[in-house]
A protein has these predicted regions:
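Bacterial N-terminal signal peptides
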Residues: 7-18
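Positively charged n-region of N-terminal signal peptides that target proteins for export
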Residues: 1-5
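N-terminal alpha-helical modules
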Residues: 21-140
Length: 140
C-alpha cells in the first residue's frame, strides 16, 4: 500500500470512527471556515471527504436495494445481473478513485497542501459518483 493511500485510509478511518467528534470541530477549537494552519485545514478537509463518502455509500446501498426490490417484484428481469454489474463497477470506480487521488497526492508531495489536495480529490470524486448513481437509478 502506498504512503498516500495509507494516509488517506488513516484519515478516513479516523473520521469514520470519530464521526460524532469530527462533526463538531468547534468543540476542539477549530473553525473550519477559517482554519489556522495546515493541520486544521487537513482535519476539516478530511471531515468533508468522510461526509461525501458516507453519502455515496448510502446512495450506493439504495441503488442495490432498488435493484433487488425490482427483481423480487418481477418488475425487472435483468435486475439481478444489473446488481452484479453495479458491484463490479463500484469496485472498479474505487480503484480509479484511489489511483486518481494518489496521483494528486504525488503531484503535491513536496508541499504542505498534499493531504488537503488528496482529501479534495476524494471529496470531488465521491460527490460526482453519488450524482451518477442518483441519475442512473433515479434516486432522490
Amino acid at each position: 500500500m502506498t504512503l498516500p493511500r495509507v494516509l488517506a485510509s488513516v484519515a478516513l478511518w479516523g473520521c469514520l470512527c470519530g464521526a460524532a467528534i469530527a462533526a463538531d470541530r468547534s468543540a476542539e477549537g477549530i473553525d473550519c471556515a477559517q482554519p489556522s494552519g495546515t493541520m486544521e485545514s487537513d482535519l476539516c478537509a478530511s471531515d468533508v471527504a468522510s461526509e461525501a463518502d458516507t453519502e455515496l455509500n448510502a446512495v450506493y446501498a439504495q441503488a442495490r436495494q432498488q435493484l433487488r426490490r425490482q427483481a423480487a417484484e418481477g418488475a425487472c428481469t435483468h435486475c439481478a445481473d444489473a446488481e452484479k454489474q453495479l458491484i463490479l463497477a463500484q469496485r472498479a470506480w474505487m480503484q480509479l478513485r484511489d489511483h486518481d487521488c494518489d496521483a494528486v497526492y504525488a503531484f503535491n508531495a513536496d508541499g504542505t497542501s498534499r493531504n488537503g489536495a488528496q482529501m479534495h480529490c476524494l471529496t470531488t470524486l465521491a460527490r460526482d459518483r453519488t450524482r451518477q448513481l442518483r441519475d442512473f437509478y433515479e434516486l432522490l
